[in-house]
């Protein structure tokens, strides 16, 4: 008997959990500015490092803030700042040297001014952690020169997310901004609609959603928005023949805005990073179990659990809501701008399809009839359908591309355009044979038996226990199924093994 060995490169899932992190910091206001109030706070959280240790993952990152303030002389201005955080996430099974992926999600943010002209910021974030171990495992794939050996095999699907390339794109866009004198805030949200593989690279098509907040020549707070399509052919120097799916992930690395020399418009300079990935797949047949009729073989087996990447699905979700102005607030004369921060609370099985349920934390900044700037917030429940089958192991992110508000009086109509991105995984458990040894034949009684099977037992279980081949078991029990019900009679003629 000669086992055939092979080495599998596995990504084993060691643990997965979620924890909440509290982030706080003090943000000094610009020198020479006396702040009357903070109108609106926006933030983005980005985890930068994750280090695995025994039973935990240590993470740190940055909370980037944009605070829209009003000075004591009634002039709006924007403050950009950041604060660092570090946190420890308990993860059972984590060990030093393993790899952790952290997906942070901002749940709540609060700001307050103190007497020293500083803003105290408190934020709560969900930290979703997945810990995996890259392991080369030596396994048995088959057996040579074995007599009367029954073997069973499993197909292991080895899939990996493989980075192909990354490119940095610079673009310049112009937004109409009548009467603009000062730029306060600029944001860009790139969305990729389509990625196709061509002979000389990956063709990427999408839309850039641009937004700017500025002051006009009457010191009024104004907003400008535009959508700009883009396309790019990204060269790929690596072999992509093994790729089953190609995905492109965009992110804004830098953005700045200036008033054009002619006035009446804003010039935005954007640097966008696009990372191109693919999923490679390899199906490997491995030995999962074996036995000999005389019981003279011992197989050591090990169960391995993998979280196998399947695909990344990106889509759009459009929502329209009517928001009511709180009783204590004045009527709306003009909506200045509207923001939304999506928070995903649960993944839902929507008739077999994946859906994300959550809250849109919405802020409406508006001017009243006297020209004063006001703000109110409301939490809007949402559900976004995703073009993918339901999977409890999916990692879903929802982000706003564009939020538009309009209306006067006591209500505001808000149109949300959200991007959904679902990374789909398949939880795979593989039984692998990691060792095999010949042993003394088992002692068995000659005779005829009728075995009453337990619920869920298989012919393999019975054959291995009593030392009979699958062919013999089928011959004696012509109506044998793949799995037994409780009390199913199985006829066995035991005539192998070492006799008593």
Feature-to-residue mapping (PLM):
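Membrane-lipid interaction segments
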Residues: 1-445
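Primarily a LysM-type cell-wall glycan-binding module
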Residues: 438-475, 480-500
């Amino acid at each position: 008997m000669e086992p055939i060995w092979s080495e599998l490169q596995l990504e084993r899932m060691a643990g997965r959990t979620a924890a909440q992190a509290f982030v706080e910091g003090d943000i000094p206001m610009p020198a020479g500015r006396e702040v009357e109030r903070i109108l609106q706070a926006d933030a983005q959280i980005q985890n930068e490092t994750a280090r695995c240790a025994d039973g935990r993952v240590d993470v740190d990152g940055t909370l980037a803030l944009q605070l829209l303030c009003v000075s004591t002389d009634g002039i709006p201005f924007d403050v950009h700042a950041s604060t660092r955080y570090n946190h420890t996430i308990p993860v059972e099974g984590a060990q030093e040297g393993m790899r952790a992926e952290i997906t942070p999600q901002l749940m709540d943010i609060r700001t307050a001014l103190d007497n020293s002209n500083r803003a105290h910021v408190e934020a709560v974030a969900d930290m979703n952690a997945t810990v995996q171990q890259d392991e080369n495992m030596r396994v048995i794939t088959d057996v040579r020169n074995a007599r009367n050996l029954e073997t069973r095999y499993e197909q292991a699907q080895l899939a990996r997310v493989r980075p192909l390339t990354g490119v940095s794109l610079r673009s310049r866009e112009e937004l109409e901004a009548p009467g603009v004198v000062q730029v306060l805030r600029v944001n860009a949200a790139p969305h990729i609609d389509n990625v196709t593989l061509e002979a000389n690279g990956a063709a990427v098509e999408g839309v850039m959603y641009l937004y700017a907040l500025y002051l006009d020549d009457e010191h009024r707070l104004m907003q400008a928005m535009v959508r700009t399509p883009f396309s790019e052919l990204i060269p790929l120097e690596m072999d992509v023949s093994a790729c089953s799916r190609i995905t492109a992930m965009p992110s804004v690395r830098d953005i700045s805005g200036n008033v054009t020399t002619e006035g009446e418009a804003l010039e935005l300079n954007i640097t966008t990073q696009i990372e191109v990935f693919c999923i490679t797949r390899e199906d490997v047949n491995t030995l999962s179990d074996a036995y000999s009729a005389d019981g003279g073989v011992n197989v050591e087996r090990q169960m391995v659990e993998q979280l196998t990447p399947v695909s990344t699905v990106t889509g759009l979700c459009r929502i329209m809501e009517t928001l009511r102005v709180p009783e204590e607030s004045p009527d709306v004369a003009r909506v200045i701008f509207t923001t939304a921060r999506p928070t995903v609370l649960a993944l839902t099985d929507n008739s077999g399809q994946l859906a994300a349920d959550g809250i849109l934390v919405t802020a409406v900044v508006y001017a009243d009839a006297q020209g004063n700037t006001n703000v109110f917030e409301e939490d809007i429940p949402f559900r976004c359908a995703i073009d993918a089958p339901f999977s409890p192991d999916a990692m879903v992110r929802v982000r706003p591309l564009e939020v538009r508000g309009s209306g006067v009086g006591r209500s505001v109509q808000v149109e949300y355009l959200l991007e959904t991105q679902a990374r789909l995984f398949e939880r795979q458990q593989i039984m692998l044979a990691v060792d095999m040894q010949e042993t003394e034949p088992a002692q068995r009684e000659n005779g005829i038996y009728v075995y009453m099977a337990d619920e869920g037992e298989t012919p393999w279980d019975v054959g291995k226990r009593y030392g009979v081949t699958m062919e013999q078991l089928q011959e004696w029990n012509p109506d044998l199924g793949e799995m037994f019900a409780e009390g199913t009679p199985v006829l066995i003629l035991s005539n192998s093994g070492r006799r008593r």
